[in-house]
């Protein structure tokens, strides 16, 4: 590897590891003694997640164990040997769960329709069961910053909700804690890292399902913004960490009926008849001015 390329790779690797470490710390994702089940699909995100957690396991101030789990859903053409060979080479504890969800999905969903929703529900149930069998205290998923932003817009545009993908949550069955250590990582960084590491990627469309058109459109919109307006994606993600319930319209989050004029001036209060002015110019992390334009609490 040439000197310049090696420097670029080291910088990329350090950024991903730093982002993951910060997310883990900010959201209290990993505790001493945790046994973490890392869901490994064979895609760039889950490979990067496992690689990053293996590194952090060596340097973290707390002790935790890892077990990689892959769900073989018996999709046609699934390369069964790829993940075992990779994990054996790494010396990582792992479990391959074989469940023929492919046949169930094909039976229930008409030809040509998107199967992702049913497939996801089936997969989730199997992974929850597996986590219980392995006595895992946390389930780690490989979703990243861009997934979270895409989900925010999907819910706003198509679900009428201001809701994204949380970095940490209790599972819907109430039995598990799910964490997303790559919550701060950029997809473009993960793509570059995955290519540089030459992970043995397994295609995600072996089932033949049509791509989720709504998510595809959101991704195209965000990619367009990222190119046309550098820093907009960074600003969007920072906004997700600076929610002001009193300035939205959800009465379940803020008691608007209780708002009264108390006669006390507040120099930091909002001016009802003035429009907000914005002076912060968010740039991408590749920009030399990035660090000076992001609130300190969002830096490493």
Swiss-Prot record:
The keyword NAD does not apply. One of its GO terms (molecular function) is 4 iron, 4 sulfur cluster binding. It catalyses: cytidine(32) in tRNA + S-sulfanyl-L-cysteinyl-[cysteine desulfurase] + AH2 + ATP = 2-thiocytidine(32) in tRNA + L-cysteinyl-[cysteine desulfurase] + A + AMP + diphosphate + H(+). Its EC number is 2.8.1.-. GO terms for cellular component: cytoplasm. Disulfide bonds: none annotated. Its cofactor is Mg(2+); [4Fe-4S] cluster. It holds the Pfam family ATP_bind_3. InterPro entries: Rossmann-like_a/b/a_fold, TilS/TtcA_N, tRNA_Cyd_32_2_STrfase, tRNA_thiolation_TtcA_Ctu1. It comes from the Bacteria. Keywords: 4Fe-4S, ATP-binding, Cytoplasm, Iron, Iron-sulfur, Magnesium, Metal-binding, Nucleotide-binding, RNA-binding, Transferase, tRNA processing, tRNA-binding. Gene3D superfamilies: HUPs (3.40.50.620). Pathway: tRNA modification. GO terms for biological process: tRNA thio-modification. A motif (PP-loop motif) lies at residues 41-46. [4Fe-4S] cluster binds at residues 116, 119, 207. It is found in: Cytoplasm. Binds 1 [4Fe-4S] cluster per subunit. The cluster is chelated by three Cys residues, the fourth Fe has a free coordination site that may bind a sulfur atom transferred from the persulfide of IscS. It is an enzyme of class 2 (transferase). Homodimer. The thiolation reaction likely consists of two steps: a first activation step by ATP to form an adenylated intermediate of the target base of tRNA, and a second nucleophilic substitution step of the sulfur (S) atom supplied by the hydrosulfide attached to the Fe-S cluster. Catalyzes the ATP-dependent 2-thiolation of cytidine in position 32 of tRNA, to form 2-thiocytidine (s(2)C32). The sulfur atoms are provided by the cysteine/cysteine desulfurase (IscS) system. Belongs to the TtcA family. This is tRNA-cytidine(32) 2-sulfurtransferase. The gene is ttcA.
């Amino acid at each position: 590897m040439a000197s310049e390329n090696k420097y670029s790779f080291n910088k990329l690797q350090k950024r991903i590891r730093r982002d993951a470490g910060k997310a883990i710390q900010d959201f209290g994702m990993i505790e001493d003694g945790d046994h973490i089940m890392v869901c490994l699909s064979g895609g760039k995100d889950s490979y990067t997640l496992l690689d990053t957690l293996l590194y952090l396991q060596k340097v973290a101030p707390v002790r935790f164990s890892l077990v990689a789990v892959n769900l073989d859903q018996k999709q046609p053409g699934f390369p069964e040997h790829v993940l075992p060979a990779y994990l054996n080479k790494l010396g990582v504890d792992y479990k391959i769960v074989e469940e023929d969800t492919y046949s169930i999905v094909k039976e229930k969903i008409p030809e040509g329709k998107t199967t992702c929703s049913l497939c996801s529900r089936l997969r989730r149930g199997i992974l929850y069961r597996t986590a219980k069998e392995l006595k895992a205290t946390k389930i780690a998923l490989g979703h990243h910053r861009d997934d979270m932003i895409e989900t925010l817009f999907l819910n706003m545009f198509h679900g009428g909700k201001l809701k994204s993908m949380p970095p940490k949550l209790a599972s819907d069955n109430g039995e598990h804690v799910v964490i997303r250590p790559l919550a701060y990582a950029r997809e473009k960084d993960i793509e570059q890292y995955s290519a540089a590491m030459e992970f043995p990627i397994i295609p995600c469309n072996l089932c033949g399902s049509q791509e989720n058109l709504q998510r595809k459109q959101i991704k195209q919109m965000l990619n367009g913004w990222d190119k046309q307006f550098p820093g907009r994606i960074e600003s969007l993600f920072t906004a997700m960490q600076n929610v002001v319930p009193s300035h939205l319209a959800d009465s379940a989050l803020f008691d608007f009926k209780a708002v009264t004029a108390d006669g006390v001036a507040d120099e930091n209060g909002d001016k009802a008849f003035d429009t907000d002015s914005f002076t912060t110019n968010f740039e991408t992390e590749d920009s030399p001015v990035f660090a000076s334009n992001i609130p300190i609490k969002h830096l490493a």
